[in-house]
Amino acid sequence: MGEPAFTSFPSLPVLGKLKRNMMPWALQKKREIHMAKAHRRRAARSALPMRLTSCIFRRPVTRIRSHPDNQVRRRKGDEHLEKPQQLCAYRRLQALQPCSSQGEGSSPLHLESVLSILAPGTAGESLDRAGAERVRSPLEPTPGRFPAVAGGPTPGMGCQLPPPLSGQLVTPADIRRQARRVKKARERLAKALQADRLARRAEM
């Protein structure tokens, strides 16, 4: 009889090389999703977001750092907003809507109707019209005025409709002229404040 054939047994796993994930599958999946979102957020934060509320020109928002000289304080989620909504101001405007005496909300007046009611005429125009009305007969209607009410004053006396606002166009020259006026006014104010400060210091 020959020698028995050598049968090879599979080697037992070495404990040092045995690696097993002890994390449950659901928790592992949640961790992978969280890491993917964090990676996308880091990629999106490579460029500074743009602020659209403080100025008409776009400029980058200051990042939040642990530094005392930071000027902008905001939450983490606000840096990804394209155009933040002014909810507080909108609610204040809603609270200021006109209401009737019964408490019911009424529609706001248009700008043209308000101007047609409240726009006063100039003093020179009212004097010229007063002199011209003495020559006219009392039954002749005056253009641009309301008809007189029997037993009461004329509601349109001294009121004239203003020119339409659509005809008044603002040009770049007007903007530059206004900017120069503002700059000169600020310079005059700074000089006056400096002179007042020096005078108070001299009195002390």
Curated annotation (Swiss-Prot):
Region: Disordered, residue numbers: 126-145
GO biological process, one term: negative regulation of transcription by RNA polymerase II
Single GO molecular function: methyl-CpG binding
Compositionally skewed regions (Basic and acidic residues) per UniProt: 126-137
Cellular compartments per GO CC: nucleus
Additional notes on this entry: The MBD3L proteins are encoded by strongly repeated regions of the 19p13 chromosome. The exact number of functional copies is unclear, and some of them may represent pseudogenes.
Family under the similarity heading: Belongs to the MBD3L family.
Protein name: Methyl-CpG-binding domain protein 3-like 2B
Source organism of the structure: Homo sapiens (Human)
Lineage, uppermost ranks: Eukaryota, Metazoa, Chordata, Craniata, Vertebrata
Gene: MBD3L2B
